Amino acid sequence: MSQYHTFTAHDAVAYAQQFAGIDNPSELVSAQEVGDGNLNLVFKVFDRQGVSRAIVKQALPYVRCVGESWPLTLDRARLEAQTLVAHYQHSPQHTVKIHHFDPELAVMVMEDLSDHRIWRGELIANVYYPQAARQLGDYLAQVLFHTSDFYLHPHEKKAQVAQFSNPAMCEITEDLFFNDPYQIHERNNYPAELETDVAALRDDAQLKLAVAALKHRFFAHAEALLHGDIHSGSIFVAEGSLKAIDAEFGYFGPIGFDIGTAIGNLLLNYCGLPGQLGIRDAAAAREQRLNDIHQLWTTFAERFQALAAEKTRDAALAYPGYASAFLKKVWADAVGFCGSELIRRSVGLSHVADIDTIQDDAMRHECLRHAITLGKALIVLAERIDSVDELLARVRQYS
């Protein structure tokens, strides 16, 4: 019988005392629940001086923002912990460290990152971290290369694909990215003023064919162990540092999905900046976002190709020029998935603060409309946008 029970703050303290690796566990005396996501309880555990020393995270058996009417598997906690452990192995400087995991309690203890800030909040506040995009590109190159066919023996790769099978969480992604925004659904969430724009998504045959192709690639292309939800709210930043967290959507899928989701969130910030900062002040920040996108992709591509040249184990995949050709396909996928992220965050269940916190209704609606229009263009034109420079030109065109 499972010993699962929902943690209280007292439980979190007792658990951290046992598993957080603190030299003097009795110094841990209090906890505060700080989770602002949709799926989990998250506790900060404090010492006697009020300093946060560890994080205790527990999966809930339902979607928190909906309630018990939307049940979820607790096995996602195992998948998150194992994904983060695997990613830490390949990119320790950019992945949160897991101290302990218990599959029956669906709980993990991880390093405290109180000296970092959530990147999304910093982007909204126009606090610039010039190294962040390059570090994110390096993280993605390291973890995606080292869990791909370029590096893993075929037997090991197939074993890992089975280990990280994540059907319940993938189903959520499939619905929120590729189904809900293109049909009338109770989970969709958008202002009535955008009804005409959203109805146009449902009626666009060319768009829906392109979305179907993206969904099929999400199903069928087990290229590497993805983070699965790598957006600016699942990344912590500090001066000179970046750490990825929240990997419960981890599974083996198309590399372009992680790249596209990351770029998509930078573009969501781009779309929201006029409402956050005012049109005049937003101009420079928007150029920074475009520069971030350029740095993210070029760092990822250069690092991935360098790793491929040095470490590819398969003789056929090591043939000169193949890694470069492979990345062209990854790029096309990334552009399409980027567009789907823009649309689902504008009309679907889960929005982003970059736009939702804009106070002026008319401006907020215009920023949402911009994201929808841009997302649609990127999905439909993905195969023709053949470089990051071409992507940035398209973004400027739709501004």
UniProtKB/Swiss-Prot annotation:
It comes from the Bacteria. One of its GO terms (biological process) is L-methionine salvage from methylthioadenosine. InterPro entries: Aminoglycoside_PTrfase, Kinase-like_dom_sf, Methylthioribose_kinase. It catalyses: 5-(methylsulfanyl)-D-ribose + ATP = 5-(methylsulfanyl)-alpha-D-ribose 1-phosphate + ADP + H(+). ATP binds at residues 40, 57, 111-113, 246-248. Pathway: Amino-acid biosynthesis; L-methionine biosynthesis via salvage pathway; S-methyl-5-thio-alpha-D-ribose 1-phosphate from S-methyl-5'-thioadenosine (hydrolase route): step 2/2. Its EC number is 2.7.1.100. The keyword Amino-acid biosynthesis applies. One of its GO terms (molecular function) is ATP binding. Keywords: Amino-acid biosynthesis, ATP-binding, Kinase, Methionine biosynthesis, Nucleotide-binding, Transferase. It holds the Pfam family APH. Substrate binds at residues 229, 344. Belongs to the methylthioribose kinase family. Homodimer. Catalyzes the phosphorylation of methylthioribose into methylthioribose-1-phosphate. HAMAP family: Salvage_MtnK. This is Methylthioribose kinase. It comes from Klebsiella pneumoniae (strain 342). The lineage of its organism: Bacteria, Pseudomonadati, Pseudomonadota, Gammaproteobacteria, Enterobacterales.
